[in-house]
Amino acid sequence: MQVPRVKLLMGSGAMFVFAIIYGWVIFPKILKFMISKQVTLKPGSDVRELWSNTPFPLHFYFYVFNVTNPDEVSEGAKPRLQEVGPFVFDEWKDKYDLEDDVVEDTVSFTMRNTFIFNAKETLPLTGEEEIILPHPIMQPGGISVQREKAAMMELVSKGLSIVFPDAKAFLKAKFMDLFFRGINVDCSSEEFAAKALCTVFYTGEVKQAKQVNQTHFLFSFMGQANHSDAGRFTVCRGVKNNKKLGKVVKFADEPEQDIWPDGECNTFVGTDSTVFAPGLKKEDGLWAFTPDLCRSLGAYYQHKSSYHGMPSMRYTLDLGDIRADERLHCFCEDPEDLDTCPPKGTMNLAACVGGPLMASMPHFYLGDPKLIADVDGLNPNERDHAVYIDFELMSGTPFQAAKRLQFNLDMEPVEGIEPMRNLPKLILPMFWVEEGVHLNKTYTNLVKYTLFLGLKINSVLRWSLITFSLVGLMFSAYLFYHKSDSLDITSILKENNKVDDVASTKEPLPPANPKQSTTAHPVQVPNTLIPGTNPATHPAPHLKMEHRERY
């Protein structure tokens, strides 16, 4: 049976075109469309439920810099630091008081973070270790007064000596007291200076202090932030425009901040860091607004990575060089005076938190080398101190991440406060934190079996179709080539047989010589002709025939 060459060629070509168009154009569009419809913050959706109440805790680590030579530093010596940690906590995130605006396609909510001490993961530490840090009230308060309200220095100095009798520039206290339980602030004195100092506690200006009775407060770095309001956000739901999913449009009911001297730095860029839009391009970066810094930060693509066998993109970020980057000059105290810009790798938080604090990467990683040289005990490296995010772009899923940040005191001598008079001027690391997440198989399997399984099936299908179509195209090409380059032997033989049949029906002419015998012995011709032919009817052309015809 003959193979239908034309049909085979057309079918193989159609299969090849279909595999290309469906595998690389139609299927990705269908998949992206399905993801865009599923990944929204519309009430009742699975993503909305996971987003509003994270069903697993994040890992939160504290690393504290213990000052081992506090008395020497008080006299101007170089600080020697000892890193103590990690102190491990489970951080639970939830959002409450959710309000949807269907017209604007937004949802407003209040963020809440709850920290629970994980004693098992903290071992061999217990949280009861004594740490020596800059006095968390005296030093920031004294420096702020010297910079902004120098005329009140004498009153503040006297008030500090009453509220904190015999206090030094550095305080020794247990980790849990400094960070969660609180250190005692006694405002029971009737002295005017003490009452004036305690006014900032009673009015709530010191956000880290909690009033326990009429005359006493407890001060801690994190106690007030634990299981309390962490800010009111308004973000896009992504129902009308999936590309805007999670985008912050308001914080504290304001469309922009009023903290930095230039409007661009006050703009909200990115999400609340708990959700990202699907279908991002790697060059877009991952942007999120960070209330602790009063600033939006963008992570940039670093390299390809993988998580539990699934491909992902590795992103990282840093605080940049505010002085060198013109776009960041609005984070300087005076954008027109670059001398007011913080050193490379740091950010001045004074305008954000109301105190002389600086943010940086842990151990001043990627920062100005002078910052590291000013103290002993730092060892910056990428593995331990860089920020990273392993992100799946198509679904907008962060597989794992480590957000790291260090808080430093912008220390300087304060002439009006005796214990601080001889302090060196430098940026002193106090502690750094890491907020980490690593999705387990329960959640990665959702991505694996809905996204990657579909991609795998599509990949196998399209390459199988391409393979079959190429085989068909090559076979049909072979058939066409064989047809044009070879003889149709059967047709030729049939044509020759027809000619011989006609010749055999002709009546023979009489012999030219009557005396010549009309019977001749035929010459025996070897059968060297084409197989299937009759040697008698097809004599070899090079042999002379006994019988000749006259014309």
Curated annotation (Swiss-Prot):
Keyword terms of this UniProt record: Cell membrane, Disulfide bond, Glycoprotein, Membrane, Olfaction, Receptor, Sensory transduction, Transmembrane, Transmembrane helix
Transmembrane residue ranges: 8-28, 460-480
Coiled coil: none
SS bond list: C265-C330, C294-C352, C332-C341
Region Disordered: start-end pairs: 502-551
Entry-listed glycosylation sites: N66, N213, N226, N440
Residue numbers on the Extracellular membrane side: 29-459
Single Gene Ontology MF annotation: scavenger receptor activity
Membrane topology: Multi-pass membrane protein
Broad class of the protein's primary localization: membrane
Entry's Gene Ontology BP terms: cell surface receptor signaling pathway; cellular response to pheromone; detection of chemical stimulus involved in sensory perception of smell; lipid homeostasis; pupariation
Localization (cell): Cell membrane
Gene Ontology annotations for the cellular component aspect, listed alphabetically: cilium; cytoplasm; dendrite; neuronal cell body; plasma membrane
A Pfam family per the record: CD36
Family: Belongs to the CD36 family.
Name of this chain's protein: Sensory neuron membrane protein 1
